[in-house]
UniProtKB/Swiss-Prot annotation:
Residues 91-100 have a biased composition (Polar residues). A secreted protein. Acts as a strong host (human) T-cell antigen. Involved in translocation of bacteria from the host (human) phagolysosome to the host cytoplasm. Might serve as a chaperone to prevent uncontrolled membrane lysis by its partner EsxA; native protein binds poorly to artificial liposomes in the absence or presence of EsxA. EsxA and EsxA-EsxB are cytotoxic to pneumocytes. EsxB (and EsxA-EsxB but not EsxA alone) activates human neutrophils; EsxB transiently induces host (human) intracellular Ca(2+) mobility in a dose-dependent manner, monocytes and lymphocytes do not respond. Residues 81-100 are annotated as: Disordered. Induction: Constitutively expressed, part of the esxB-esxA operon. The keyword Chaperone applies. This is ESAT-6-like protein EsxB. May be secreted as a 4 coiled-coil complex with EsxA. The C-terminal domain is required for interaction with both EsxA and EccCb1; the last 7 amino acids are necessary and sufficient for EccCb1 binding and secretion. The modification N-acetylalanine is found at residue 2. Disruption phenotype: Bacteria no longer translocate from the phagolysosome to the cytosol of host (human) cells probably due to polar effects on the downstream esxA gene; bacteria replicate in phagolysosome, decreased apoptosis of infected host (human) dendritic cells. Loss of ability to lyse host (human) lung epithelial cells, possibly due to polar effects on the downstream esxA gene; in BALB/c-infected mice bacteria are not as invasive and cause decreased lung disease. No growth in the human macrophage-like cell line THP-1, no cytotoxicity. Inactivation leads to absence of EsxA and EsxB from cell lysates. Keywords: Acetylation, Cell wall, Chaperone, Coiled coil, Host endoplasmic reticulum, Secreted, Virulence.
Amino acid sequence: MAEMKTDAATLAQEAGNFERISGDLKTQIDQVESTAGSLQGQWRGAAGTAAQAAVVRFQEAANKQKQELDEISTNIRQAGVQYSRADEEQQQALSSQMGF
């Protein structure tokens, strides 16, 4: 397995990328819901029922994906905080041992 190197700033940047993607997805969800809402009065019969069901499936899947992206972002941010804390503790321990 390849070695992974990172730092707190990189983790924060990547968390921001996931937040941006989540925000973009939310924009798409809102656009689909708006379009579906404006067309809903025109949906009739089996085709209308199928269209409504498709919108519901889309909403469920997209909302689940957004939730996953938000959780990933949170986890990355927490990892960055933990990384910084551990780095600081190691720096203090080393400084203490060396008498700095």
